[in-house]
Amino acid sequence: AAPVAPPIKAQAEKAGPVTRQIVFTAPVRGYAINSVFGLRKLAIEAKARAHKGVDIAAPQGTSVFTAAEGQVLRTGYDAGGYGNFIEVRHPNGMTTLYGHLSRIDVASGDRLTPAQRIGLVGSTGYSTGPHLHFEVRRDGAQVNPTKVMDRHFEIAVKPKA
């Protein structure tokens, strides 16, 4: 008789966690960034100051999509800044903030699918015209959103119980 190979034993603990990827995409489609991340001076302000996100000018009512899957941390209104805003936590630990919205279509705790519509472009709060203010935060600190757009992030997949 031919020799029989011993059974193969799975050693998942050595293989590491199962992973998958998420991709951050532009929250407004078809419109360019008109105000970049970093120091800027607005015509209505005396001094330059840090701009902690990017602005994407688009017509009032243009759809805004989540940059990646995640869960809504909070929504609200900030009269002195963001106006109507949404903050989302993503599986890679980053958070995104969408400001100056004319309408919010999600609520705190909602789970979001990739590129799900979450609201509409507006000009609420401290704003000079319709646009989306978009921020990305890592460990609570703002990072340049253009550094994460169209970038793939590998995340661990939790085993099902």
Give residue ranges: language-model regions.
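Non-catalytic extracellular/periplasmic "stalk"
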Residues: 1-30, 160
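Catalytic cores of peptidoglycan-degrading enzymes
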Residues: 22-160
